[in-house]
Amino acid sequence: MGMRMMFIMFMLVVLATTVDTFTSDRALDAMNAAASNKASRLIALAVRGCCARAACAGIHQELCGGRR
């Protein structure tokens, strides 16, 4: 193999690795965003449950807007 062919093969490997990494990162970002949204919804449900109980709402007034 000549130097030019080796250089072309090297560039193809670099390009393939870069494209694969870029698409993998985007897929992971989407999965992380979905997990974060799910966690936020679960936390909101827990806070609403706490705010519905007077004892818990009294302890965590900053979460329940100061209401009992």
UniProtKB/Swiss-Prot annotation:
Residues 22-48 form a propeptide. The modification Glycine amide is found at G65. Residues 1-21 form the signal peptide. GO terms for cellular component: extracellular region; host cell postsynaptic membrane. One of its GO terms (molecular function) is ion channel regulator activity. The keyword Heme does not apply. Keywords: Acetylcholine receptor inhibiting toxin, Amidation, Disulfide bond, Ion channel impairing toxin, Neurotoxin, Postsynaptic neurotoxin, Secreted, Signal, Toxin. The cysteine framework is I (CC-C-C). Alpha4/7 pattern. Alpha-conotoxins act on postsynaptic membranes, they bind to the nicotinic acetylcholine receptors (nAChR) and thus inhibit them. Has a distinct nAChR binding mode from other alpha-conotoxins, due to a different three residue motif (Ala-Xaa-Ala instead of the conserved Ser-Xaa-Pro motif). Belongs to the conotoxin A superfamily. This is Alpha-conotoxin-like Lt1.2. It comes from Conus litteratus (Lettered cone).
